[in-house]
Amino acid sequence: MADEAALALQPGGSPSAAGADREAASSPAGEPLRKRPRRDGPGLERSPGEPGGAAPEREVPAAARGCPGAAAAALWREAEAEAAAAGGEQEAQATAAAGEGDNGPGLQGPSREPPLADNLYDEDDDDEGEEEEEAAAAAIGYRDNLLFGDEIITNGFHSCESDEEDRASHASSSDWTPRPRIGPYTFVQQHLMIGTDPRTILKDLLPETIPPPELDDMTLWQIVINILSEPPKRKKRKDINTIEDAVKLLQECKKIIVLTGAGVSVSCGIPDFRSRDGIYARLAVDFPDLPDPQAMFDIEYFRKDPRPFFKFAKEIYPGQFQPSLCHKFIALSDKEGKLLRNYTQNIDTLEQVAGIQRIIQCHGSFATASCLICKYKVDCEAVRGDIFNQVVPRCPRCPADEPLAIMKPEIVFFGENLPEQFHRAMKYDKDEVDLLIVIGSSLKVRPVALIPSSIPHEVPQILINREPLPHLHFDVELLGDCDVIINELCHRLGGEYAKLCCNPVKLSEITEKPPRTQKELAYLSELPPTPLHVSEDSSSPERTSPPDSSVIVTLLDQAAKSNDDLDVSESKGCMEEKPQEVQTSRNVESIAEQMENPDLKNVGSSTGEKNERTSVAGTVRKCWPNRVAKEQISRRLDGNQYLFLPPNRYIFHGAEVYSDSEDDVLSSSSCGSNSDSGTCQSPSLEEPMEDESEIEEFYNGLEDEPDVPERAGGAGFGTDGDDQEAINEAISVKQEVTDMNYPSNKS
């Protein structure tokens, strides 16, 4: 492009002449030059009187042969004659079009890349989009080189030069996610100029939410920006529901995107983060000054004290673990040419060990390390000795007295951008994919969490995970231990996949929930009745009254003690407490303490007193089954079973889907974890489909405008439901580290 610009700026030249010079020079003498088709409007691809269709080949005038300058001049005069013959109106159209993207015959200039969607989340502008993608794909060698033109080292990782380009990248998820008609930054800018109160906008976006008064206006506007940046939610396809449908898709699809998280590495023995003896707990003991466990992944904290990170690095450094069945399954799909791309959030490099070639490491990996100062880059083996000896690795090229000359593994820390390669890949893969499979990820952190909503909504989506993801709508949900599910799929796929199976037994399907285990029945028989006396007219608050509060506290304590063995999940010898259960218990105990408080009985009139006590009692009743008797449905299955819950949910061993004792309604392990009150409402098996986003109403009637890429920042405030997840994910990247890119047994 630099050469083209130089030629175009030569005195007496023109962009078209420059292109013609090059084309004529590269063609053997005597061969005709082809006229490039023009896309600038009707009638410009042929001369008057010529039939429609492809442009005919042209002969260079004999006098011009062998003289590139003369050939260019001849073609230029011929083009001018055509434009004049086409009429004044067409000439004006040609002039306007040439100014935008066509520099005349012989050279088509670089096309300007418009926003991804000019209309509100409109993905139908195929004509212009296809031409742009073809040009961009040709420029980066798309599909010809899986690393998009980057150099490949023998171990399959980037060269230093390509990584430096990635660090300087300004690419973002706005390059591949559906864009609104008017961007969120423009929308906010307009309202800032007219003095709109951001709380008014937030009230429309989140009617049931009241932002804390201490939040300043700029923080609230940042919240608005992030909410408006959310792409519309995908709706489930009604024609894809069963595991048989999933197997058929795996057999037929040729461009599969597999998005993997920590769940695929659990069985590999990689230490978890959040258990009692996990990495976080041990770091808290060794580094009491660490403000919070996630700080070890904060780039600013790393510059101040890199020791916590390198202690963690030793725990999961490459070379200590072997790939899981999930990794091998993806590698075989890659080998058979079915894998379009594996986007992994993990940093353990097990994808490379398994032999996966089409891999995008969204959050980096331990494969290489580079100096914070000079960017000198080395292989992971160069710093292995220092890391295992718990010595902070230093850059060999920087001065010894430079405190920041640290060799940092190329993991994406909080405060750092994702590699440009991720955004480049997603920009084109989103239009190529014919099947999306999410394995072992809760998709809580952006921009990876935006992938399911950003690909065409008709593309089938399959979830393989321990727990359901209520904020997304998958066509088939296979819930349980990822290796168990992949093992069953391999049995059904047969051939080379069947050879991967760790368990030779094919599972049998049941459609009715198995009865409770003897252990659970014995436990339930010892429980006292629900600690609320509800009359026949339970809808009347006047007739609902709690018993003595001390009874509730006593019963809760007994239940907590008896239920300890039911509130943990097993994962290959590692026990992890359910944080949402703990949170629920705290809420219940807090309510009980309020009931014990004698001041509560002395507040207000008798009517106000009764209503307040009724409200507390109602909260306790909602919390009671969640705290007292929730059990994993998967524990009722025998070793060779899985449960089918129509229309599209399957429960395998290890699934974190629970059953409440009172009404036996299924609920997710994450139920109630985002609720301020701690209450939990069990979702139905077939979750209602969401209507189109209400956010679209903000854009109706507004003109198309480009917008700057989105950036995460700001702070959030409490609310319930999907809106809370949208805010939490969009506002701060500092969230669930283990759900982001660091392996744990809770994915």
Curated annotation (Swiss-Prot):
Pfam families: SIR2. Its EC number is 2.3.1.286, 2.3.1.-. Residues 120-135, 687-707 have a biased composition (Acidic residues). Residues 2-139 are annotated as: Interaction with CLOCK. Residues 537-549 have a biased composition (Polar residues). Signal peptide: none annotated. NAD(+) binds at residues 261-280, 345-348, 440-442, 465-467, 482. A motif (Nuclear export signal) lies at residues 138-145, 425-431. Interacts with XBP1 isoform 2. Found in a complex with PCAF and MYOD1. Interacts with FOXO1; the interaction deacetylates FOXO1, resulting in its nuclear retention and promotion of its transcriptional activity Component of the eNoSC complex, composed of SIRT1, SUV39H1 and RRP8. Interacts with HES1, HEY2 and PML. Interacts with RPS19BP1/AROS. Interacts with CCAR2 (via N-terminus); the interaction disrupts the interaction between SIRT1 and p53/TP53. Interacts with SETD7; the interaction induces the dissociation of SIRT1 from p53/TP53 and increases p53/TP53 activity. (Microbial infection) Interacts with HIV-1 Tat. This is NAD-dependent protein deacetylase sirtuin-1. It comes from Homo sapiens (Human). The lineage of its organism: Eukaryota, Metazoa, Chordata, Craniata, Vertebrata. The gene is SIRT1.
